[in-house]
Amino acid sequence: MYQVDLPPDPKEVAAIEARRNQEREQQSRFFNVRTRVMGVDVEALNNQVEERKLQEATERSKEAAYGTNQVRYDLVAQMLEKEQAERTRRLAKKVQNFREQRQKLRNRCELDFWNSNQLWREFPAYLGDNAPYYGQASLQCFSGEDLERATYLRMQQEQFQYSLERQLQEQQQARVDENCADMLNDQLRLAMDMRAAQLAKLEESCRIAMMAATASANKAQAVKLAEQQGQEHQRQQEANLVEVQNQITSDLLTENPQVAQNPVAPHRVLPYCWKGMTPEQRATIRKVQETQHHEKEAQRQAEQALDAKWESQAINLAQAAKELEEQERELCAEFRRGLGSFNQQLAMEQNAQQNYLNSIIYTNQPTAQYHLQFNTSSR
């Protein structure tokens, strides 16, 4: 048989490469003493705890700063709300004063829509020529008959004096209100400035305290990191010294082949103590290799003999197939010759039959009149 070089399976190649990588990783973990770690890394856990504490302290300082800012904003908002409430109160007071002074009940001129006869009922019955409810349109007072002019003039002067005094009072009250408002605004601005200065000082002190705390934390962390590095360097030096001492005092540098034997599995060896094979082991391996070589040679000869048999059998089969093909061609040619003669005879018989039909049987040909006698009615 012939050997055919087939391409390797990608899945099998990937699996082999994965096993090789896993074996290399295991060897790097097992045989490298410096990188091999047994148990829990307490130092790393402590570092994580310290980092967590530092992060929490930083977050608390940030929250304190945010709280200070929030208090400041709340105070400013309260002051603004108080100022807005004061403005609203002053405006309401002015509106109320205007209503009390300008919109008195006795001076209103509105008409009561619910009582349309109110104006007529306000006028009493006829009292005389000097009745105050009747004017010039009522024909009660004619030209040259103004008997109460002095009274009217006095009342007019009193009205003017009252209006002037009221205007003076309003102007004075407006000036007083304006002065009070200005004084309150000045006091409010002064209080807001003082509060803003206090909050700025408080914020500056918080910032300085935060910076000092951050600097102290960074300094402590740097000192701790330096101590950890020094301890790590010292541990590494001690590990190197221990390794050198172990190499000197152990059986690794000896030439004793018994050191490499595994006490648990005698058929295995310890890789880090193995110094090579003994002459007996090498002789055994050579003997096994020679035996395998002889077996391989015998197998190769057997395969060659089997291949020769297969080749001879293939030649015989090819020759037999060739003979069968020749016989098949001869039979096909004979069959075609017989079929041709049979077809020729059949054609002659059919021609004779057709001539018989045309000359003897089908002598009376139908005319058009014969075909017209059919299908002449609907039934």
From Swiss-Prot:
Pfam families: RIB43A. Signal peptide: none annotated. GO terms for cellular component: axonemal A tubule inner sheath; sperm flagellum. Its main location: cytoplasm. Residues 43-111, 285-337 form a coiled coil. The keyword Secreted does not apply. Disulfide bonds: none annotated. GO terms for biological process: flagellated sperm motility. Keywords: Cell projection, Cilium, Coiled coil, Cytoplasm, Cytoskeleton, Flagellum. It is found in: Cytoplasm, Cytoskeleton, Flagellum axoneme. Microtubule inner protein component of sperm flagellar doublet microtubules. Belongs to the RIB43A family. This is RIB43A-like with coiled-coils protein 1. It comes from Bos taurus. The gene is RIBC1.
